């Protein structure tokens, strides 16, 4: 009988402990909700609960998300108050909806078809319904003005969740091992993966990387690859005939054995012809003969004292630019800041922020500051525009906002 009461008491103790743990959890959640409401004034407890559940009850993240997306949270509350309290995954998936104006609706194959028809690169975004990183990507990257402008005329964005059939097929085919969110660019014609981002994805870095695809669309990329293959094939065919080629220092074992036998026999020794000297002499003769046939002979460069003083003066004037101002900080209001990506002749790319109200001459100052001393000479800036290009005027009296240069790709070319 005593044993029976002992087991009963043990069961009651376990039940009491579980109830106590649950009450402690609820008490802590109520504390977090109260703390949130002290910071987010005039908000409801339901708003606080939704945000805290979205961030796994992390008060700092919940407050940060609220402060940066206050308007979006009202939509979250409206769309989720009608749901059940257990449906946290569904509620979380609506916290940061992707901006519909940059997304392509439909299946993957149709997105590829549209990309091919419009000659646009296809950006695939593998998302998670529950991971906070996916919602932050929607909020901080896809909703970013610079990202939207970069994507607008060069890319199609197709988003898919990792728990869907299409999402699983994409993960398997492209061997995606990183957890969502994952973003990658593919050539819709070949399906080749060109570039990929995963983990914490910053808006500035993805803009800079995406601008590399502005130079050419998928069709031009395929044409370039085809030309390269044809060139390689032609070079291979020509090299197989060994026309006008100087023999390599080593001919291989069987040729060396033949040479040794030939030297031992002291008979007619065959020496491979070398065309290098004859070609050099011929080229030199052709150069000088062409010079003698024209009166417009231009002497070689003889030093600075032989340069036209007017040209030197003009070049020096062109290289005088205003003092470069300090770059706006990250906490600056986005509505007054623009970002530009500059591509230099040596292939380097630099990104720089300017105030929209600043004069465009500062762009020349920025470019000049990143050119090596040995290469500093007159240059011009060209704005990359799909299907065309626009040479910028250094003397134009305009701001970045007025000129339309905000969030564009600029190329530095020599005069």
Swiss-Prot record:
Q: Which terms are listed as keywords in the entry?
A: Ubl conjugation pathway
* Gene Ontology CC annotations of this record: nucleus
The UBA domain covers which part of the protein? 19-69
UBX domain: residues covered: 333-413
PROSITE patterns, A to Z: UBX (PS50033)
Picking any one GO biological process from the record gives: proteasome-mediated ubiquitin-dependent protein catabolic process
Q: Which SMART domains match?
A: UAS
Question: What would be one Pfam family of this protein?
Answer: Thioredoxin_7
The UniProt entry, under Gene3D superfamilies, shows: DNA helicase RuvA subunit, C-terminal domain, Glutaredoxin, Phosphatidylinositol 3-kinase Catalytic Subunit, Chain A, domain 1
InterPro entries to which the protein is assigned, alphabetical: Thioredoxin-like_sf (IPR036249), UAS (IPR006577), Ubiquitin-like_domsf (IPR029071), UBX_dom (IPR001012), UBX_domain-protein (IPR050730)
The GO terms describing molecular function are:
ubiquitin binding
From what superkingdom does this record's organism come? Eukaryota
Q: List the PANTHER family.
A: FAS-ASSOCIATED PROTEIN (PTHR23322), PLANT UBX DOMAIN-CONTAINING PROTEIN 16-RELATED (PTHR23322:SF78)
The entry's protein name is Plant UBX domain-containing protein 16
């Amino acid at each position: 009988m005593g044993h029976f009461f002992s087991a009963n008491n043990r069961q009651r103790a376990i039940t009491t402990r579980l109830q106590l743990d649950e009450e402690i959890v609820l008490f802590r959640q109520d504390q977090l909700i109260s703390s949130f409401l002290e910071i987010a004034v005039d908000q409801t407890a339901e708003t606080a609960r939704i945000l805290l559940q979205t961030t796994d009850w992390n008060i700092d993240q919940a407050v940060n998300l609220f402060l940066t997306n206050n308007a979006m949270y009202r939509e979250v509350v409206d769309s989720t108050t009608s749901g059940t309290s257990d449906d946290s995954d569904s509620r979380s998936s609506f916290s940061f909806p992707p901006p519909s104006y940059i997304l392509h609706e439909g299946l993957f194959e149709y997105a590829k078809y549209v990309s091919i028809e419009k000659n646009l690169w296809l950006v695939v975004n593998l998302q998670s319904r529950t991971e906070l990183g996916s919602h932050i990507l929607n909020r901080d990257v896809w909703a970013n003005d610079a990202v939207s402008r970069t994507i607008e005329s060069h890319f199609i964005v197709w988003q898919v969740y990792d728990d869907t059939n299409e999402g699983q097929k994409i993960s398997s085919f492209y061997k995606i091992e990183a957890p969502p969110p994952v973003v990658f660019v593919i050539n819709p014609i070949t399906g080749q993966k060109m570039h990929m981002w995963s983990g914490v994805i910053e808006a500035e870095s993805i803009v800079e990387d995406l601008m590399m695809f502005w130079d050419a669309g998928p069709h031009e990329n395929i044409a370039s690859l085809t030309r390269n293959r044809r060139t390689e094939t032609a070079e291979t065919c020509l090299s197989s005939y060994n026309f006008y080629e100087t023999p390599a220092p080593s001919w291989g074992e069987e040729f060396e054995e033949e040479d040794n036998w030939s030297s031992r026999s002291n008979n007619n020794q065959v020496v491979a012809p070398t065309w290098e000297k004859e070609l050099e002499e011929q080229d030199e003769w052709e150069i000088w003969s062409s010079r003698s046939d024209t009166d417009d002979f231009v002497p070689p460069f003889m030093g600075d004292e032989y340069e036209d003083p007017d040209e030197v003066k003009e070049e020096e004037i062109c290289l005088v630019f205003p003092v470069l101002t300090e770059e706006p900080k990250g906490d600056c209001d986005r509505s007054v800041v623009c970002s530009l990506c500059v591509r230099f002749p040596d292939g380097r790319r630099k990104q720089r922020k300017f105030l929209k109200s600043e004069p465009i001459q500062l762009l020349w100052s920025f470019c000049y500051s990143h050119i090596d001393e040995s290469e500093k000479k007159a240059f011009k800036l060209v704005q990359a525009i799909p299907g065309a290009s626009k040479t910028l005027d250094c003397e134009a009296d305009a701001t970045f906002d007025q000129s339309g240069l905000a969030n564009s790709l600029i190329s530095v070319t020599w005069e």
